[in-house]
Amino acid sequence: MKLECIAPAKINLALHVIGRRTDGYHLLESLVAFAAFGDRLSVEKAEADTFLLAGPFRDGLEGSGNFVLNARDLLREKFASRASSPVAITLEKNLPVASGIGGGSSDAATGLKLLTRYWEIETEPAELAQIGLGLGADVPMCLFGQPLIASGIGEKLEPVSTLPSLPILLVNPGLPLATPAVFSSLVERENAPLPPAPRNKSAAELVNWLRLTRNDLEPAALSIMPVIGIVLRLLQTEGALIARMSGSGATCFGIFETASKARQAGEMISRRHPGWFVRATQTRASMPELSHV
């Protein structure tokens, strides 16, 4: 039996930094959506554990530090003999690393879902989310995999079930950006919270709501990597209704009126910057399905 599933890109449509705890963790409020595009993960029966990397961003992800292998090992630590049988894991890495769109966290979350299904381990969503939190603050929201408001340090999740699908263009200038460096460069750590969550809104109404919000990490990221400003200006020039950085960067997204306009903008930017990661996709209203092959 082979199981596979997409590990979707996580898009912070809005991200407000509203405080800082005494332990140093920042308090956030973020409207999060997930894209129809992402990495792809599969697991299948094997005589011995194997881990195969494929895709354009596979380099440098070998070894014990990989989020997927950490997810496998954490499940074995918790469930012992129930998770002992060997497994062949393949990760097709389609998302840039350290790019603000949750690639590693989404990989870990998808690994947890696939492996618990493969080993026939029954867990409650809350239990799996707690396991995921041990792998990273963003893993629980990636396990949820649907539009949501994240708060606290990212562990408090409130579903936003009526968020419309949005045509978006993802653009990364081909440079990794470390999250700790961005948070360390923050000047203001106590900002206004998000407006009331958008519900039952059309795509146009959602865009208007987003114009009332921001990504508070964007100025700090720009101070470290000024090319992010070029990305944002290009998205605006090519017709994005709104252009913003996702997460701690450096990936930016543009929301477009139609999928066709997003693709056309992507083609134009790719021609001007062939070394950049450019992908037209859309946000999705539900989590990706696990499939048997």
Swiss-Prot record:
Molecular functions per Gene Ontology: 4-(cytidine 5'-diphospho)-2-C-methyl-D-erythritol kinase activity; ATP binding
User: What keywords were assigned to this record?
Assistant: ATP-binding, Isoprene biosynthesis, Kinase, Nucleotide-binding, Transferase
Question: Which residue ranges run through the membrane?
Answer: none
Reactions performed catalytically: 4-CDP-2-C-methyl-D-erythritol + ATP = 4-CDP-2-C-methyl-D-erythritol 2-phosphate + ADP + H(+)
Q: Which Gene3D superfamilies match?
A: 3.30.230.10, GHMP kinase, C-terminal domain (3.30.70.890)
Q: Where is the active site?
A: K10, D138
Q: What is its EC number?
A: 2.7.1.148
Question: Which pathway does it serve?
Answer: Isoprenoid biosynthesis; isopentenyl diphosphate biosynthesis via DXP pathway; isopentenyl diphosphate from 1-deoxy-D-xylulose 5-phosphate: step 3/6
Keyword ATP-binding listed? The answer is yes
Enzymatic class: transferase
- What disulfide bonds does the UniProt entry report for this chain? none
Where on this chain does ATP bind? P96, V97, A98, S99, G100, I101, G102, G103, G104, S105, S106
Under the heading InterPro entries, the entry gives: GHMP_kinase_C_dom (IPR013750), GHMP_kinase_C_sf (IPR036554), GHMP_kinase_N_dom (IPR006204), IspE (IPR004424), Ribosomal_Su5_D2-typ_SF (IPR020568), Ribsml_uS5_D2-typ_fold_subgr (IPR014721)
- Does Glycosyltransferase count among this protein's keywords? no
What is one Gene Ontology biological process annotated in the Swiss-Prot or TrEMBL record? isopentenyl diphosphate biosynthetic process, methylerythritol 4-phosphate pathway
Q: Which NCBIfam families match?
A: ispE, PRK14608.1
Belongs to which family?
Answer: Belongs to the GHMP kinase family. IspE subfamily.
Tell me the function of this protein.
Catalyzes the phosphorylation of the position 2 hydroxy group of 4-diphosphocytidyl-2C-methyl-D-erythritol.
User: Any idea what this protein is called?
Assistant: 4-diphosphocytidyl-2-C-methyl-D-erythritol kinase
The species this protein belongs to is Chelativorans sp. (strain BNC1)
